Amino acid sequence: MLTAVCGSLGSQHTDAPHASPPRLDLQPLQTYQGHTSPEAGDYPSPLQPGELQSLPLGPEVDFSQGYELPGASSRVTCEDLESDSPLAPGPFSKLLQPDMSHHYESWFRPTHPGTEDGSWWDLHPGTSWMDLPHTQGALTSPGHPGALQPALGGYVGDHQLCAPPPHPHPHHLLPAAGGQHLLGPPDGAKALEAAAQESQGLDSSLDAASRPKGSRRSVPRSSGQTVCRCPNCLEAERLGAPCGPDGGKKKHLHNCHIPGCGKAYAKTSHLKAHLRWHSGDRPFVCNWLFCGKRFTRSDELQRHLQTHTGTKKFPCAVCSRVFMRSDHLAKHMKTHEGAKEEAAAAAQGEGKAGGVVEPPGGKGKREAEGSSASSN
């Protein structure tokens, strides 16, 4: 018996590859003539409502079969669900509710807004996507009386979210009688500013009047100028006398405090340069190639640079010589003055040796003067 069963299975296995595929019953395509209706005009209607119902849309599904819902005591059928819908009966009538503007509105809006606290925003197909309370001046959509009001305070609508705040004094922006716009501060603020400026000027005048005369400076000092600390200036400051060329009796007021020096200068800059000579500080350096010499004064550096450039800025007005330093030119001018004196002395000696020619009438005048002196 087992042998017969195995033989039958083997025969079926061997015959399976040689089996021919099932024959398909294909029919030729038929041309379809479109039906025209008077309502459609010149455009042909491809299908009629009766033909639409006869066309199969997919595998047939029996919607009459009931389904058991979790938590339900009895079976619920699709007919029972369709009877509750206000739309035309159909299997997809409950996919969209009549008050929903889109598929996801039920996520934001509860089904019964009167019995449940709503969220702070609401979506609806009106002109504005956000509804605000009536107490805050919002405009709600008339087509949705049950729309929830958002709990946003301080805003009057979505069109005014970016608007500037109202001016606290709108009457200041109104045009004046003369046609000018008062865009500046009000008159009260101007009056307060003027009063503050007057009080500041009065305080400064009182401070200047209460200041003692000895503490006032005859010459104003600039912000970058420092006070000289030489012995003469310190003594003058202690006595209350003005330290300067106007109030001092001596010409050289700023003296060197190094013991044994005693040099005095009329300018504080010269005294500072002299003190740098004592300390050995030479801040002015020549930047010429392979030079690098240092100097205590800036004018010394400038004169040194002229040796590199060869420029001579001080020409002599008498002769054609040019000098790099003004003191050299002054010394050279003395030679010209000495030559003039020598020439004048030589001309005077030549006149004495050759005889002096008397002007006409000179001898008679001398005789008259001599006779008048003897008679007296």
Swiss-Prot record:
Basic and acidic residues: bias regions: 334-343
Compartment(s): Nucleus
Disruption phenotype: Develops fewer, smaller, incisors at 3 months of age in a transcription factor ASCL5/AmeloD knockout background. Epithelial cell invasion is inhibited and CDH1/E-cadherin ectopically expressed in dental epithelial cells at 3 months of age, in an ASCL5 knockout background.
Chief subcellular location: nucleus
Keyword Aminoacyl-tRNA synthetase carried by entry: no
A Pfam family that the UniProt record links to this protein: zf-C2H2
InterPro entries: Znf_C2H2_sf, Znf_C2H2_type
GO MF annotation list: DNA binding; zinc ion binding
Bias-annotated ranges (Low complexity): 344-360
Keyword tags: DNA-binding, Metal-binding, Nucleus, Repeat, Transcription, Transcription regulation, Zinc, Zinc-finger
Highest taxon in the source lineage: Eukaryota
GO cellular component, one term: nucleus
Zinc finger (C2H2-type): 254-278, 284-308, 314-336
Known function: Promotes cell proliferation. Plays a role in tooth germ growth. Plays a role in the control of enamel mineralization. Binds the AMBN promoter.
Family: Belongs to the Sp1 C2H2-type zinc-finger protein family.
Domain notes: The 9aaTAD motif is a transactivation domain present in a large number of yeast and animal transcription factors.
Name by which UniProt lists this protein: Transcription factor Sp6
Organism: Mus musculus (Mouse)
High-level lineage: Eukaryota, Metazoa, Chordata, Craniata, Vertebrata
